């Protein structure tokens, strides 16, 4: 997971810039709608909704917008939120890099067409369901900041049924667990006074394709940026790592 986390750190820097875009507000609002639709519209009893709300607040989405999204998901605003569905698309990027795209859409034909164009114009191709998902494992991830003592983090992580952790930056760690144990892990870490900046479910590549050429990196990152810019796309995950010199070239 080391290389993936290295790139994930750059992605988080990029997210600070992307968070200023209206499309990110739309994505986070849709995540709240789906979470409220799939469970009860009360964050205290709906972990998926609670984490979606936390992400929205971290991005600066006003409380009124959050409450409206919850109401849409609960069906109390008479909206068409019931037409939204979660779909995972799969494909390949330049150099055979495997790519997973998670979308929320009210028109799967439109979304598939948009994705197909994005892939084909940027050196990739949209594949069939299952063509690359076997290369990834879904994990729960807690991002912890202000880690001053790794032994304390390890102890708390074990109590919370974590599988592993990794220091990805100075005093910043990612703690991994089974998806079913994510709520327990996050609650345990908080109870031990660790600061969690994000709690999420993430696709983790089992193996990675090393990107060592700048031209391939440019094509791949252009494809990912294009995919992430589509209105229906919630997240994009790929099984690549980059050489340090290339990462520095694209750092913000």
What are these regions (language model features)?
Residues 1-127, 132-141, 252:
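N-terminal cationic and glycine-rich segments that engage phosphates or anionic surfaces
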Residues 143-252:
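Positively charged, low-complexity, intrinsically disordered RNA-binding extensions
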């Amino acid at each position: 997971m080391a290389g993936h986390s290295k790139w994930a750190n750059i992605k988080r820097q990029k997210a600070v810039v992307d968070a200023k875009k209206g499309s990110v507000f739309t994505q986070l609002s849709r995540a709240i709608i789906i979470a409220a639709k799939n469970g009860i519209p009360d964050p205290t009893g709906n972990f998926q909704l609670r984490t979606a709300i936390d992400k929205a607040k971290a991005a600066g989405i006003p409380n009124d917008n959050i409450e409206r999204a919850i109401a849409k998901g609960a069906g109390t605003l008479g909206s068409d939120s019931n037409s939204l569905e979660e779909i995972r698309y799969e494909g390949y990027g330049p150099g055979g890099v495997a790519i997973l795209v998670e979308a929320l859409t009210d028109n799967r034909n439109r979304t598939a067409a948009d994705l197909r164009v994005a892939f084909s114009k940027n050196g990739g191709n949209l594949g069939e369901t299952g063509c690359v998902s076997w290369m990834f494992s879904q994990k729960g991830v807690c991002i912890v900041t202000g880690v001053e003592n790794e032994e304390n983090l390890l102890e708390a992580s074990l109590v919370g049924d974590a599988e592993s952790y990794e220091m990805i930056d100075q005093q910043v760690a990612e703690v991994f667990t089974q998806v079913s144990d994510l709520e327990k892990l996050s609650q345990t870490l908080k109870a031990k006074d660790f600061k969690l900046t994000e709690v999420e479910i993430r696709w983790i590549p089992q193996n990675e394709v090393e990107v060592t050429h700048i031209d391939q990196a440019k094509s791949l990152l252009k494809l990912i940026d294009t995919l992430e810019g589509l209105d229906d796309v919630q997240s994009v995950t790929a099984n690549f790592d980059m050489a340090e010199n290339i990462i520095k070239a694209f750092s913000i």
